[in-house]
Amino acid sequence: MKIIISPAKTFKIRKLKKENIDCLFENKKNALVSIMKEKSIEELKSMWKCSDKIAEESYKLYKNFDVSPKGCAIRSFDGIQYQYMDVDSLDEDKLEYLEEHLRILSGLYGILRPFDQISKYRLDFEDKFINLYEFWEDEIRNHFEGEEIIDLASKEYGQNIYKYLDKAPVKIEFKEEVLIDGDIKLKTKATPSKILRGRMVNYMARNHIENIEQLKKFSCDGYNYSEKNSDKKKLVFVKSLVSE
Protein backbone atom coordinates (compact mmCIF):
# COMPACT_ATOMS: atom_id res chain seq x y z
CA MET A 1 0.00 0.00 0.00
CA LYS A 2 1.20 3.49 -0.86
CA ILE A 3 -0.13 6.85 0.32
CA ILE A 4 0.30 9.76 -2.10
CA ILE A 5 0.37 13.41 -1.02
CA SER A 6 1.19 16.74 -2.65
CA PRO A 7 4.29 18.82 -1.97
CA ALA A 8 3.99 22.25 -0.36
CA LYS A 9 4.88 25.62 -1.85
CA THR A 10 6.53 26.73 1.40
CA PHE A 11 9.68 25.32 2.95
CA LYS A 12 11.64 25.20 6.18
CA ILE A 13 14.72 23.17 5.36
CA ARG A 14 15.23 20.83 8.32
CA LYS A 15 17.28 17.72 8.84
CA LEU A 16 16.44 14.27 10.15
CA LYS A 17 18.93 11.90 11.73
CA LYS A 18 18.31 9.34 9.00
CA GLU A 19 18.19 10.64 5.42
CA ASN A 20 18.58 9.26 1.90
CA ILE A 21 21.55 10.89 0.16
CA ASP A 22 19.96 10.59 -3.29
CA CYS A 23 16.35 10.81 -4.38
CA LEU A 24 14.79 8.03 -6.45
CA PHE A 25 15.30 9.68 -9.82
CA GLU A 26 18.43 11.78 -9.40
CA ASN A 27 19.39 11.93 -13.09
CA LYS A 28 16.00 13.15 -14.29
CA LYS A 29 15.81 15.67 -11.46
CA ASN A 30 19.24 17.01 -12.45
CA ALA A 31 18.09 17.31 -16.07
CA LEU A 32 15.17 19.50 -14.99
CA VAL A 33 17.42 21.62 -12.77
CA SER A 34 19.76 22.19 -15.73
CA ILE A 35 16.84 23.39 -17.85
CA MET A 36 15.59 25.70 -15.10
CA LYS A 37 19.07 27.20 -14.64
CA GLU A 38 18.91 28.46 -18.22
CA LYS A 39 15.66 30.33 -17.68
CA SER A 40 15.83 34.11 -17.40
CA ILE A 41 13.92 36.08 -14.79
CA GLU A 42 11.51 37.25 -17.48
CA GLU A 43 10.92 33.69 -18.68
CA LEU A 44 10.17 32.55 -15.13
CA LYS A 45 7.84 35.49 -14.58
CA SER A 46 5.97 34.65 -17.78
CA MET A 47 5.81 30.91 -16.98
CA TRP A 48 4.39 31.40 -13.51
CA LYS A 49 2.48 34.67 -14.05
CA CYS A 50 4.14 35.82 -10.84
CA SER A 51 5.62 38.99 -9.35
CA ASP A 52 9.15 40.25 -10.05
CA LYS A 53 10.13 39.29 -6.51
CA ILE A 54 9.04 35.64 -6.86
CA ALA A 55 10.69 35.34 -10.28
CA GLU A 56 13.96 36.80 -8.97
CA GLU A 57 13.96 34.55 -5.90
CA SER A 58 13.29 31.46 -8.02
CA TYR A 59 16.01 32.47 -10.50
CA LYS A 60 18.52 32.63 -7.64
CA LEU A 61 17.26 29.32 -6.22
CA TYR A 62 18.08 27.46 -9.42
CA LYS A 63 21.35 29.26 -10.09
CA ASN A 64 22.53 28.21 -6.61
CA PHE A 65 20.70 24.89 -6.51
CA ASP A 66 23.83 22.70 -6.32
CA VAL A 67 25.08 24.42 -3.17
CA SER A 68 21.74 25.20 -1.54
CA PRO A 69 20.88 23.73 1.90
CA LYS A 70 19.29 20.29 1.86
CA GLY A 71 16.86 18.77 4.31
CA CYS A 72 14.60 15.77 4.81
CA ALA A 73 11.51 16.01 2.57
CA ILE A 74 8.97 15.12 5.26
CA ARG A 75 10.33 17.86 7.56
CA SER A 76 11.26 20.49 4.96
CA PHE A 77 7.92 20.98 3.22
CA ASP A 78 5.99 23.39 5.44
CA GLY A 79 2.40 23.57 4.19
CA ILE A 80 -0.67 23.04 6.37
CA GLN A 81 -0.88 19.31 5.66
CA TYR A 82 2.76 18.84 6.68
CA GLN A 83 2.36 20.85 9.87
CA TYR A 84 -0.54 18.64 10.96
CA MET A 85 1.33 15.43 10.15
CA ASP A 86 3.35 16.38 13.24
CA VAL A 87 6.21 14.08 12.26
CA ASP A 88 8.32 15.36 15.18
CA SER A 89 5.93 13.50 17.50
CA LEU A 90 6.58 10.17 15.76
CA ASP A 91 9.17 7.68 16.98
CA GLU A 92 11.55 5.79 14.69
CA ASP A 93 9.17 2.87 14.14
CA LYS A 94 6.41 5.18 12.91
CA LEU A 95 8.79 7.17 10.73
CA GLU A 96 9.90 3.91 9.12
CA TYR A 97 6.23 3.19 8.36
CA LEU A 98 6.05 6.50 6.50
CA GLU A 99 9.30 5.82 4.65
CA GLU A 100 7.82 2.55 3.39
CA HIS A 101 4.30 3.73 2.58
CA LEU A 102 4.23 7.52 2.04
CA ARG A 103 5.14 9.10 -1.30
CA ILE A 104 5.25 12.81 -2.13
CA LEU A 105 4.52 13.72 -5.76
CA SER A 106 6.80 16.47 -7.05
CA GLY A 107 7.20 18.33 -10.32
CA LEU A 108 10.98 18.50 -9.86
CA TYR A 109 11.77 15.22 -8.10
CA GLY A 110 8.99 13.06 -9.55
CA ILE A 111 8.35 10.91 -6.48
CA LEU A 112 9.88 11.55 -3.08
CA ARG A 113 10.23 9.26 -0.09
CA PRO A 114 9.94 10.96 3.33
CA PHE A 115 13.68 10.62 4.09
CA ASP A 116 14.87 11.92 0.70
CA GLN A 117 17.00 15.06 0.76
CA ILE A 118 15.53 18.07 -1.02
CA SER A 119 16.41 21.69 -1.62
CA LYS A 120 13.95 24.55 -1.80
CA TYR A 121 12.49 24.81 -5.32
CA ARG A 122 9.52 26.02 -7.32
CA LEU A 123 8.09 23.76 -10.04
CA ASP A 124 4.58 22.33 -10.19
CA PHE A 125 3.16 19.66 -12.48
CA GLU A 126 0.84 22.16 -14.17
CA ASP A 127 3.40 24.90 -14.78
CA LYS A 128 3.62 26.06 -18.42
CA PHE A 129 7.05 24.51 -18.82
CA ILE A 130 7.04 21.02 -20.29
CA ASN A 131 4.43 18.33 -19.75
CA LEU A 132 5.73 17.06 -16.43
CA TYR A 133 3.05 14.38 -16.22
CA GLU A 134 4.47 12.82 -19.39
CA PHE A 135 8.05 13.50 -18.27
CA TRP A 136 7.49 11.42 -15.13
CA GLU A 137 5.04 8.93 -16.67
CA ASP A 138 7.33 5.86 -16.69
CA GLU A 139 8.58 6.48 -13.16
CA ILE A 140 5.04 6.89 -11.83
CA ARG A 141 3.79 3.81 -13.67
CA ASN A 142 6.67 1.57 -12.55
CA HIS A 143 6.92 2.78 -8.96
CA PHE A 144 3.24 2.25 -8.18
CA GLU A 145 2.72 -0.92 -10.21
CA GLY A 146 0.49 -3.38 -8.35
CA GLU A 147 0.12 -1.11 -5.33
CA GLU A 148 -3.08 -0.22 -3.51
CA ILE A 149 -2.97 3.58 -3.45
CA ILE A 150 -4.54 5.93 -0.92
CA ASP A 151 -4.87 9.38 -2.49
CA LEU A 152 -4.41 12.19 0.04
CA ALA A 153 -3.08 14.60 -2.59
CA SER A 154 -4.67 17.65 -4.17
CA LYS A 155 -6.46 17.12 -7.49
CA GLU A 156 -3.53 18.66 -9.39
CA TYR A 157 -1.14 16.04 -8.11
CA GLY A 158 -3.40 13.09 -7.42
CA GLN A 159 -6.15 12.60 -9.97
CA ASN A 160 -4.04 13.79 -12.90
CA ILE A 161 -1.70 10.78 -12.56
CA TYR A 162 -4.50 8.19 -12.38
CA LYS A 163 -4.21 7.34 -16.07
CA TYR A 164 -0.64 6.14 -15.53
CA LEU A 165 -1.60 3.68 -12.77
CA ASP A 166 -2.62 0.06 -13.23
CA LYS A 167 -4.95 0.13 -10.21
CA ALA A 168 -7.45 2.89 -9.47
CA PRO A 169 -6.50 4.77 -6.27
CA VAL A 170 -8.91 5.33 -3.42
CA LYS A 171 -9.47 9.07 -2.99
CA ILE A 172 -9.98 10.43 0.53
CA GLU A 173 -12.50 13.26 0.87
CA PHE A 174 -13.55 15.33 3.88
CA LYS A 175 -16.94 17.04 3.76
CA GLU A 176 -19.20 19.00 6.11
CA GLU A 177 -22.97 18.86 6.21
CA VAL A 178 -24.35 22.37 5.75
CA LEU A 179 -27.91 23.68 5.57
CA ILE A 180 -28.55 25.60 2.36
CA ASP A 181 -32.08 26.82 1.56
CA GLY A 182 -33.52 24.20 3.88
CA ASP A 183 -31.59 21.30 2.35
CA ILE A 184 -28.62 19.46 3.81
CA LYS A 185 -25.67 19.55 1.42
CA LEU A 186 -22.12 18.25 1.63
CA LYS A 187 -19.43 20.87 1.26
CA THR A 188 -15.65 20.55 1.06
CA LYS A 189 -13.65 23.28 2.78
CA ALA A 190 -10.04 23.74 1.72
CA THR A 191 -8.26 24.48 4.99
CA PRO A 192 -10.01 21.83 7.14
CA SER A 193 -9.33 19.29 4.37
CA LYS A 194 -5.60 20.09 4.39
CA ILE A 195 -5.51 19.78 8.19
CA LEU A 196 -7.35 16.45 8.10
CA ARG A 197 -5.13 15.06 5.35
CA GLY A 198 -2.16 15.77 7.59
CA ARG A 199 -3.80 14.25 10.65
CA MET A 200 -4.76 11.15 8.68
CA VAL A 201 -1.12 10.58 7.69
CA ASN A 202 -0.16 10.85 11.37
CA TYR A 203 -2.96 8.44 12.30
CA MET A 204 -1.87 5.92 9.69
CA ALA A 205 1.71 6.02 10.96
CA ARG A 206 0.70 5.68 14.62
CA ASN A 207 -1.60 2.75 13.88
CA HIS A 208 0.42 1.10 11.10
CA ILE A 209 -2.59 1.12 8.78
CA GLU A 210 -2.24 -1.54 6.09
CA ASN A 211 -5.66 -1.62 4.40
CA ILE A 212 -8.83 0.30 3.62
CA GLU A 213 -10.94 -1.33 6.32
CA GLN A 214 -8.54 -0.16 9.02
CA LEU A 215 -8.56 3.36 7.59
CA LYS A 216 -12.34 3.62 7.89
CA LYS A 217 -11.92 3.80 11.68
CA PHE A 218 -10.27 7.23 11.42
CA SER A 219 -12.22 9.85 13.40
CA CYS A 220 -11.03 13.41 13.97
CA ASP A 221 -12.49 16.87 14.66
CA GLY A 222 -16.04 15.54 14.25
CA TYR A 223 -15.34 13.84 10.91
CA ASN A 224 -16.27 10.17 10.64
CA TYR A 225 -16.42 7.63 7.84
CA SER A 226 -19.68 7.82 5.88
CA GLU A 227 -20.54 4.55 4.19
CA LYS A 228 -23.48 5.99 2.26
CA ASN A 229 -21.31 8.66 0.64
CA SER A 230 -18.37 6.35 -0.10
CA ASP A 231 -17.74 3.80 -2.83
CA LYS A 232 -14.89 1.72 -4.26
CA LYS A 233 -13.18 4.83 -5.63
CA LYS A 234 -13.43 7.08 -2.59
CA LEU A 235 -13.72 7.14 1.19
CA VAL A 236 -15.73 10.10 2.44
CA PHE A 237 -15.50 11.38 6.00
CA VAL A 238 -18.35 13.66 7.02
CA LYS A 239 -18.82 16.20 9.80
CA SER A 240 -22.42 16.43 10.96
CA LEU A 241 -24.67 19.41 10.31
CA VAL A 242 -23.40 22.97 10.61
CA SER A 243 -25.88 25.68 9.61
CA GLU A 244 -24.74 28.17 7.01
Swiss-Prot record:
Annotated GO biological process: response to hydroperoxide
Pfam families named among the record's database cross-references: H2O2_YaaD
A single GO cellular-component term on record: cytosol
Domain of life of the native organism: Bacteria
Annotated family: Belongs to the UPF0246 family.
Protein name per its UniProtKB record: UPF0246 protein FMG_1068
Species the sequence originates in: Finegoldia magna (strain ATCC 29328 / DSM 20472 / WAL 2508) (Peptostreptococcus magnus)
Source species taxonomy: Bacteria, Bacillati, Bacillota, Tissierellia, Tissierellales
